[in-house]
Amino acid sequence: MTDSSISPSHPAGLSRALDNFLTRHRIGVWRVVVTFVLASLLFGHSRWDGTWVSPLLLTLGMLGVSLATVGRLWCALYISGRKNNTLVTSGPYSLCRHPLYVCNLLGILGLGAMTESLAVTAVLALAFALMYPAVIRTEDRFLASAFPEFAEYARRTPAFFPRLSLYRGESTWTVHVSSFQRNIADSVWFLGLSVVVESFDLFHDAGVLRAVVTLA
């Protein structure tokens, strides 16, 4: 049975339909999740505030956000101007097929840790786990149909979890400067969100905001 002949009622067809739905609506789902997080920060305060757990979570969060930002810039350096027309397999893309999403997970967990709430971090991690496997499968199907060499690339390169032994760099690399400049904003937004998260904490400490719930 070929891909084009799979019926929507077939299990594979249903799985693909669900993947496509989650891929199309992931931004809307994230908006709901972000609204929940902002409401939690507005009306809640961490139960770990004033304990040794608080600086630990903050440090881990800053580390995650920093790694995510640097990683996304590294990916943008390789992929800018080449997305959908060239199969990039070197640099970060030699470690795994979807390094941008690895960076997204690091940033999401980092932001969650910076809220100093394990519950908020768990919600963010769950949202990622529900949506991004579908996004990865959808993108893999597109790449397989667009690039004949993708099958060999997928055979040797893991989809998500990086394998450091596979790293292969380039001695020279042509950068599409205009595309890279456009992607810079997409690469550093985790830093902006980290400022927003910390602002809520400062407002609570200053008495500008009053917590009505305790965040675990």
From Swiss-Prot:
Q: Which cysteines are joined by disulfide bonds?
A: none
Location(s) in or outside the cell: Cell inner membrane
Superkingdom of this protein's organism: Bacteria
Query: What is the first-listed, main subcellular location in coarse terms?
Result: membrane
User: Encoded by which gene?
Assistant: czcN
Which GO MF term does the entry hold, naming one?
A: transferase activity
Its GO CC terms? plasma membrane
Q: State the name under which the record lists this protein.
A: Cobalt-zinc-cadmium resistance protein CzcN
Q: What does this protein do?
A: Component of the CZC cation-efflux system that confers resistance to cobalt, zinc and cadmium.
Question: Which species is listed as the source?
Answer: Cupriavidus metallidurans (strain ATCC 43123 / DSM 2839 / NBRC 102507 / CH34)
Tell me which UniProt keywords the record has, alphabetically.
Answer: Cadmium resistance, Cell inner membrane, Cell membrane, Cobalt, Membrane, Plasmid, Transmembrane, Transmembrane helix, Transport, Zinc
